[in-house]
């Protein structure tokens, strides 16, 4: 199904993210296409600027779906990133969801992202690649950056940086003390003081674990009163997007000026910005 549509911008507070887009909003297209992953097939959702400057491999939260993240994906596209987001088997909108356990879905997620990375290499050769995720998708993206090496070599060599909105927390048996020490690329985690997940994260401070233990440079933004769905909060995203954009420009595209500006960035009143050097 090809649903190519023109995007007319982001309503409300989301429309002012990061002080304005690099590309006109009416030059951004959204559609979804078939994606073959091993012996099965899923959908690959694409949000594309007219003149791509890089590719963002995006992994959704557990049970979620790509279209739910329009605020973020459109903003990334406005900054020049083609966003490629597979519909994972654990999504409530995936037709075969019932046939996969949560444990099995993790491996399938990694396979999805590998297939998306192959599309990026084929369709956008030579462009820089980043990994972006929300919640369980943040873990997926961190794995593309080299995390959880004690389970398998998940590292995708093309990925230059990882951006995550919230994390799935310290999942017993999966997230060990060394989970993120094998990260081979810089990471930024955006979380909040109210970022809890029933049954998984009781203490919002658990989301700081990536920044505290990452093997490379790590940046953590903690938004005052931000919850687990912070990624869909237009007002909060507008407030924090300048740092996000600087991080992606600095480490995704190798912009030295952006790196210097990120170093000097100050969080708005009530928020926190924590930097861990490599």
Model-derived features: positions:
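The feature captures the conserved acid-bearing segment of alpha/beta-hydrolase catalytic domains
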Residues: 156-222
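Glycine-rich His-Gly loop
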Residues: 58-62, 135, 192
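Alpha/beta-hydrolase-fold serine-hydrolase catalytic core, especially in secreted/extracellular enzymes
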Residues: 225, 234-278
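C-terminal segment of N-terminal export signals and the immediately downstream linker at the start
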Residues: 1, 21-34
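Serine-hydrolase catalytic machinery in alpha/beta-hydrolase-like enzymes
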Residues: 32-48, 52-126
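N-terminal export signals
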Residues: 5-24
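Primarily recognizes the serine-hydrolase "nucleophile elbow" in alpha/beta-hydrolase
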Residues: 118-178
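Alpha/beta-hydrolase superfamily serine-hydrolase fold, recognizing
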Residues: 48-51, 127, 176-189, 193, ...
């Amino acid at each position: 199904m090809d649903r190519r549509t023109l995007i007319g911008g982001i309503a409300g507070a989301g429309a002012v993210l990061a002080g304005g887009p690099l590309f006109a909003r009416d030059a951004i297209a959204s559609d979804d296409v078939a994606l073959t992953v091993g012996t099965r097939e899923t959908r690959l959702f694409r949000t594309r600027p007219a003149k791509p400057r890089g590719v963002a491999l995006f992994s959704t939260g557990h049970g979620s779906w790509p279209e739910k993240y329009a605020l973020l994906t459109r903003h990334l596209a406005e900054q020049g990133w083609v966003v490629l987001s597979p519909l994972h088997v654990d999504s409530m909108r995936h037709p075969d969801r019932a046939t996969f356990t949560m444990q099995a879905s993790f491996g399938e997620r990694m396979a999805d992202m590998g297939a998306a990375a192959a599309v990026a290499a084929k369709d956008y050769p030579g462009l820089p690649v980043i990994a972006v995720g929300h919640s369980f998708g943040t873990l997926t993206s961190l794995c593309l950056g080299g995390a959880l090496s004690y389970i398998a070599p998940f590292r995708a060599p093309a990925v230059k940086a990882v951006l995550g909105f919230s994390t799935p927390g310290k999942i017993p048996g999966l997230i060990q003390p060394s989970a993120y020490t094998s990260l081979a690329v810089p990471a930024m985690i955006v979380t909040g003081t109210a970022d809890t997940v029933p049954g998984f994260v009781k203490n919002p401070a658990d989301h700081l674990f990536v920044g505290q233990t990452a093997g490379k440079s790590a940046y953590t933004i903690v938004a005052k009163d931000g919850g687990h769905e912070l990624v869909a909060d237009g007002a909060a995203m507008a407030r924090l997007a300048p740092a996000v954009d600087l991080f992606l420009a600095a480490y995704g595209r190798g912009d030295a000026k952006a790196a210097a500006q990120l170093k000097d960035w100050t969080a708005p009143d009530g928020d926190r910005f924590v930097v861990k050097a490599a």
